[in-house]
Amino acid sequence: SVVLNEHPHDGIRDHEDMYPAFMKEMGQEPVQGKNIVFDAGDKKYMDAFMKHAHEESDKMGVAFWWLDWQQDYVYPVVRGTNMKHLPWLNHLYFNYSKQDNLRGAGFSRWGGWGDHRHPIQFSGDSGGNWNMLKFEIELTATSGNAGCFFWAHDLGGFYGGEDAELMARWIQFGLLNSSLRLHSVGNPDRRPWKWGEQAENSMRSVYHLRSRLMPYIYSSVRQCHTDMLPLNRAMYIEYPGEEDAYKNPQEFLFGDLLLGAPITTAGKGDAKVAEQRVWLPPHDVWYQFYSGKKYDGGQYVTESCDINSFPLFVKGGYPMPMQPYTDRMTSADLKTLVVRCYPGSEGASNSFSLYEDDGMTRDYEQGKCASTRLDYSLKDGVTEITVNPAE
């Protein structure tokens, strides 16, 4: 999908190609120097604005819009109301994006309570430094407490951050987000191949892993929709009775089965080795994704990771749906299912639901979707994995 960034507060001005048609639709003559003030409280204005500002781009394949920097400086509130502009515009843009049977979507800044209904939240023009990376990790997890489940950060930072190691570590955090998205003021250039061979290889491995994990990620997002659970979960959401769950903001659950604790400090040596302390919740077995090393839950471990890895753990005893790498992971159908299982404890019996639909339209609301239960059991030393018929 193509998404375009928009700063709409100036409306349609007299220097723009669509100005004459817009003015005529508004019942006014197109005269140089004459402009209509952007007015989100006027339905006629907004209908004409959406039509003439967006229609041409929509026909070229734009799926939805990134509403940027629309902070109440034309009017203090939406005219005729006491509502701030941002949540109202997020509502309008969300509904506009639903045309042609597409799902409503958008990127935007946080607009206050209730705003989670519409956009994927954009966290603003962040500075590129280690403290900001650390802050975004905690923000993403704790905002789920307010129903804000999906974030689209400027990975690497919008300003500054001319550090290849920092860039690679930020992308590792992006692996465990609803959106793995790059954006900056333009200097430095955030494209992964601009950061030297070591960082580029690290980032490439993250993008490839993101593709392989997409069946799990998409199924987990479906769970957000049906069960109202955040995608990035502070540890106390799943383990409210554990005191340690409240003491470790550096880590979070990504769906039911993955635990991440991204590196937020500079490493040492040529391999950029950095350490991170991780609390592993009790009553489960955990496996380091990169090394495969097994840990019993209910303890702290200190992970030393070079630039090509970070503390990423998988809960044992569950089937996790994956796929082979594909370079068009969101538009290609799932053709080859990979079910990865990390051994659980004796007697384990658990399931995971793989969810599939077309990824773009609202046809799933009419039942055009599939859920496939994956079962795992370990009994008397015998492991059994079952892929049940899709429903």
Question: Where are these predicted regions, by residue range?
Answer:
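Accessory, solvent-exposed terminal regions and/or long lumenal/extracellular loops of proteins
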Residues: 309-391
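Catalytic-domain carbohydrate-binding cleft regions of carbohydrate-active enzymes
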Residues: 1-309, 315
